[in-house]
């Protein structure tokens, strides 16, 4: 009779989670000179991270499908926060559930310098401004894909090379505050 039924496979309450704010840069930033000084807005994605373990009230294999996240509001009611599709996930593995984009955290990126050193070597400098309009301080992971062979010349914040072609910056942003990440990278193609 063409009906669709949804069945709850697994339910956890009071699951300890880590709320993460993530900005994903785009590969094209390093391919040519952008318009220095012209800011580009980037989305700040919101993730909840948790471990599928017994002590969190979970701890059993999760089949691929949709995971919905609910949160208690200030009046004790339960509010839908977001949902994401997951792959098959064994017990004791970590899940990252993307629940959407932050509306109270703003990211703007601009290229502040572009230098062609030779036919295949370039230096670029970027400024990533994060504005937090929340009533609490947050940390934002800024993930920057960088093509070619690259070397970080300088950075205002600590960073890690997460892959051959990517750097990750962790930027703390104060409550109702602004933080500016500045970095310069040399790329060889």
Region spans (language model):
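Long, intrinsically disordered, low-complexity accessory segments associated with secretion
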Residues: 1-189
């Amino acid at each position: 009779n063409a009906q669709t039924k949804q069945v709850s496979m697994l339910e956890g309450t009071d699951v300890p989670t880590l709320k993460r704010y993530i900005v994903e840069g785009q590969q094209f930033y390093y391919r040519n000179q952008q318009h220095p000084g012209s800011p580009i807005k980037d989305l700040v994605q919101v993730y909840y991270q948790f471990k599928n373990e017994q002590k969190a009230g979970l701890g059993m294999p999760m089949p691929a499908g949709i995971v919905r996240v609910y949160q208690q509001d200030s009046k004790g009611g339960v509010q839908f926060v977001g949902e994401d599709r997951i792959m098959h996930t064994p017990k004791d593995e970590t899940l990252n559930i993307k629940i959407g984009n932050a509306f109270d955290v703003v990211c703007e990126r601009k290229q502040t310098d572009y230098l062609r050193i030779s036919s295949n070597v370039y230096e670029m400098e970027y400024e990533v401004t994060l504005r937090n309009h929340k009533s609490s301080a947050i940390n934002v992971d800024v993930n920057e894909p960088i093509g070619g062979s690259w070397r970080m010349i300088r950075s205002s914040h600590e960073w890690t090379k997460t892959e051959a072609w990517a750097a990750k910056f962790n930027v703390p942003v104060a409550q109702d505050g602004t933080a500016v990440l500045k970095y310069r990278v040399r790329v060889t193609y």
